[in-house]
Amino acid sequence: MFPLNSPRSEITTVADPIYLEIFKNLYQFIAEEMGITLQNTAASVNIKERLDFSCAIFDEVGNLIANAPHIPVHLGSMADSVKSLIQDKGETIRPGNVYLANNPYNGGTHLPDVTVISPIFDRQNQEILFYLASRGHQADIGGITPGSMPPHSVHISEEGILFDNFLLVAAGQFREQELINHLTNSPFPARNIAQNIADFQAQIAANAKGERELHNMVDRYGLAMVKAYQQFVQDNAELAVRKAISVLKDGEFTYYLDNGAVIKVRITIDIDNCQATIDFTGTSDQLNNNFNAPLAVTRAAVLYVFRTLVEEAIPLNAGCFKPLHLIIPSGCFLNPVYPAAVVAGNVETSQAIVNALYGALGIQAASQGTMNNFTFGNQKYQYYETICGGSGAGANFAGTAAVQTQMTNSRLTDPEVLEMRYPVLVESFSIRPDSGGKGQYSGGDGVIRRIKFQESMTANILSGNREIPPFGLAGGKAGKIGRNAVERNDGTIEELPGTATVEVNPGDIFIIETPGGGGYGNC
């Protein structure tokens, strides 16, 4: 795993390019190993099959060092959760402790995304060297609807159980009864506690794998060298982002959501210092629905966009954010205050932010702009998926059909697994022809997904771009809007809005047609 000879005593203030590459890849490798462990040991379809999880490594003050290429909206926001833990628990953090966090106002995204955070001490248990975090989307964490993705929540308590740096493991002892009490003592308790516990234990195992690998790295290279190169890795990422910024131009964009909310963004480039200011002044106030995006989500979307402009193979880390200055007014729906509902802000508004930023930079037409969040369940079953669509076109490239875009990178569950674990049939799943916007370079097509139910359940859809189409750029046409409907077992069609909850019966078919991406350039 490690080179046999390492210059433990040759630590300088200048990075050796060979060792810089070694450490960049080594940190990412450790995060990927954490992810493999999590996938192999998790119980839920959501984590094991859909891969809706992320793993990352942080330094002793909570700065992101490296991550595996998992879910962008997780990766850009987890540092805020780690820093919240450090600020909250501080001197009480002890060897063998592990914490749970999902508070959207302390670095969380939405309540189903629960982060397990482990402090990593040196082998003498004297000093914290790192923090490890694994974030997984729980198939159900309580709330007013099965699957914990309620389309019509207006208060954070309606979306599930909140963990605010909850002590999950104390000095190596798993606090199972305290966890069960926390999951059940709520107006809207969790529905599948055994699965929650199993997935949390899988996340603990993932962090333990990362701990072993980090200790091996320190043993091999020495702490001084490891510390030096974790900073070099961040410095290298910062330089790469500054280089990408140096060729950009000022821009602004106004982006409209189906619910009437508006994102206004102005990007100002400081060429002399290779910095960018991203100003969301003028954006709509906090909403009385759940499309409010926590500050950590907005930051993650900005970080994602600027990371995608970098051509070099760098890990996403704290260095990427140093050249970026954000202005996000408190109380707007991109920086809401408690107790705003946020479940769609993470999955839907994050997509809108990315589209708005690309629009301001003039780089890419809108992608589908939604994750098409589909949940169904009852007291026995709970399932959640995000459904792919079309990506936007840009100068010199066409969009891609049937792909997860921007802030999500999750899989769809294999039909065989889905049908084995749940009383449903995947009746069809196909590309939606001609849904991408036309242009010199056309946007990618969306998809059509039809799920047939064999048992009565509650089904929910939380989606966007059902009224306003994904925009084209430079003369390109907009992509097609999405569509939601239920085909009842008697053949009647019930059209649904972008956010809806319906009761489905055996033989009913839920139909989701996802948006296409916008085109770029005149035909």
Roles of regions detected by a PLM:
Residues 2-95, 100-123, 128-277, 281-523:
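Glycine/proline-enriched, intrinsically flexible loops and inter-domain linkers
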